Structures are given as C-alpha cells and as structure tokens.
Amino acid sequence: MPTIVSYFGFLLTASTITPALFIGLSKIRLI
C-alpha cells in the first residue's frame, strides 16, 4: 500500500512540476 501512495504522490508532483517547467521555458524563449 505505501508504495502505491508514494507512486501516486510522484505522479502528482510530476504533473505539477512539468507544466511549470514548460511555462518557464516558453517565457525564456519569448524574452
């Protein structure tokens, strides 16, 4: 069970960090 919870936690953090990285890269390219 703990492994499943940590896996979902990893997916949650990845789904929030990845878009932030893409937004940061797009802002850098605009400048």
Curated annotation (Swiss-Prot):
Compartment(s): Plastid, Chloroplast thylakoid membrane
Segments passing through the bilayer: 4-26
Top-level lineage group: Eukaryota
One MF term in the entry's GO annotations: electron transporter, transferring electrons within cytochrome b6/f complex of photosystem II activity
A Pfam family per the record: PetL
Keywords noted in UniProt: Chloroplast, Electron transport, Membrane, Photosynthesis, Plastid, Thylakoid, Transmembrane, Transmembrane helix, Transport
Subunit structure: The 4 large subunits of the cytochrome b6-f complex are cytochrome b6, subunit IV (17 kDa polypeptide, PetD), cytochrome f and the Rieske protein, while the 4 small subunits are PetG, PetL, PetM and PetN. The complex functions as a dimer.
Protein name: Cytochrome b6-f complex subunit 6
Organism of origin: Nymphaea alba
